[in-house]
Amino acid sequence: AAKKAQEKKEKEQRGEEVRAAHKEKLESMTEEERAKYEEEKMAVRARRKKEAEEAKAKKQAALTAPNGVVLDLEFGHLMQDKEMRSMAKQLTFCYSANTKAQVPVRLYLTGLGGRMGEITRQACSGFNNWAVICSEESYLEKLADRKKNIVYLTADSEHELEDFKEEDIYVIGGIVDRNRYKNLTLDKANEQGIRHARLPIQNHLKMTGTHVRVPPTLLHHQRT
C-alpha cells in the first residue's frame, strides 16, 4: 500500500511539472505563435480521432468477417510451458497478420482454458482488446450448429484444399509439439467426424526440413 501511495504521489508530481512547463511555454509565446500552436494541437487530436475510428471500424470488420478461422487451443496438456509461450507468440503473429490483412478473417480462439489460457493472456500484449472471439469451450461446443461447415486444416490429410468457401469455418491446431505427436490433428478430426484437408502449400512454397513456411494470410499450418 505504501509503495502504491508513493507511486501515485510521484505520478501526480510529474503531472504538475508537465502542466507547469506547458503553461510557461504558452506564456512565452507571442499571440501568433500561440494560435499556430493551438491549430497544430487540434490537427493532432483530429488525426488521432480519425485513427481511432479507423481502428474501431477495422476491429468490427474482423469480428463480422464472413470467413471464419478457428485456432484450436485444446492441446495445452500436451505442451510444456516454454512450448505454450511459443504458441502464444504465434498467436500474436497470427493476430497481427490478420489486423493488417486487406480482407481479415473472423478469428476464434477456442479451448482457451487452463494453463494455455493463463500463458496466452500473460504473453500476448493487449490480449483483452484483441478483435477475436475467445472461448474456453471447444470449437464443437462453440460452433455446435455449424459442425457441417467445419474443416480441420492438417498437413497429414490426404485431401487437398482446392478453394476457400465463405460458408466454411477452418480449424488450425494450436500446438507446438516438435513432431512428438504424429497425426494428432488428423486423428482428432476423424474421431469427431468432421472434414479435414491440407493446404496446397507444396505447389506454392518451399519446404525447409520438416518445417512448413507459410505466408501470413494463411496464418499457421503446422505438421502435427
Language model features with spans:
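RNA substrate-binding interface of SAM-dependent RNA methyltransferases
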Residues: A1-H159
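Intrinsically disordered, low-complexity regulatory regions enriched in Ser/Pro/Gly/Thr
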Residues: A61-T64, T99-A101, A144-R146, E162-K165, ...
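Eukaryotic short linear interaction motifs
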Residues: L78-Q80, R115-E118, H159-E162, R178-Y181, ...
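C-terminal folded domains that constitute the principal catalytic or ligand-binding module
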Residues: E167-T224
